């Protein structure tokens, strides 16, 4: 690892902390971004399994260090690949009161996207739903009860880990109170 990092330029080391959002980019554009900026992570748009497999293969072949390739595996493999299995939103899984369902969501959803080269999930959603009008988490979080969110999230995380994916819990720093979308405006949470 020391040798690998030692052989990177300062710009390439800086590039490792960035995650690039891919949106219908050509393979040549992806290669150019990696070669020019040394980007270490990618978040991609939902495409067919064949397209994603090829895209992710090119990312890894072009990168000097194995890249992180992320998707939103919140409700199943359909969050990462067209035609992937939709298991259910977090609120549906939470309503079952069965932690095994949260594990299965993490495991099987992540297993599907791992098959096409994804290795990082932007899930679980660990927000606590305190306002049913919240447009971001009202149907995307496990519960309005902190204990349920905690237990379901732990199970999801274990499932994702067992499927071979790294997980990034969200949101930032938390959502669920305000009615505004913190992806677009500053909210009061």
What is each PLM-predicted segment?
Residues 23-26, 30-151, 171-189:
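Enzymes and membrane/adaptor proteins characterized by extended Gly/Ser/Thr/Asp/Glu-rich
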Residues 152-155, 159, 163:
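Metal-dependent enolase-superfamily TIM-barrel catalytic cores that perform enediolate-based chemistry
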Residues 6, 114, 161:
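Short polybasic/polar patches that bind polyanions
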Residues 6-10, 138, 164:
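A general, composition-driven signal for non-globular sequence regions
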Residues 14-15, 64-66, 117, 161-165:
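Short coil/turn connectors at secondary-structure junctions
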Residues 1-26, 156:
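Boundary/entry segment of secreted carbohydrate-active catalytic domains
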């Amino acid at each position: 690892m020391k040798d690998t990092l030692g052989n990177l330029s300062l710009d390439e080391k800086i590039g490792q902390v960035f995650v690039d959002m891919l949106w219908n980019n050509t393979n040549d554009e992806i290669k150019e971004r990696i070669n020019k900026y040394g980007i270490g992570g990618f978040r991609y748009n939902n495409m067919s399994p064949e397209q994603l497999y090829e895209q992710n293969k090119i990312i890894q072949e072009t990168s000097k260090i194995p890249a992180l390739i992320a998707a939103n595996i919140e409700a199943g493999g359909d969050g990462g690949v067209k035609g992937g299995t939709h298991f259910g939103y977090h609120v549906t899984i939470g309503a079952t009161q069965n932690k095994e369902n949260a594990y299965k969501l993490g495991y099987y959803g992540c297993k599907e996207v791992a098959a096409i080269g994804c290795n990082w999930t932007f899930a679980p959603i660990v927000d606590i739903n305190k306002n049913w009008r919240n447009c971001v988490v009202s149907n995307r979080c496990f519960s309005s009860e902190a204990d349920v969110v905690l237990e379901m999230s732990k199970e999801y995380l274990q499932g994702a880990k067992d499927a071979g994916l790294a997980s990034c819990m969200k949101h930032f720093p938390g959502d669920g109170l305000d009615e505004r979308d913190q992806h677009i405006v500053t909210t009061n949470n």
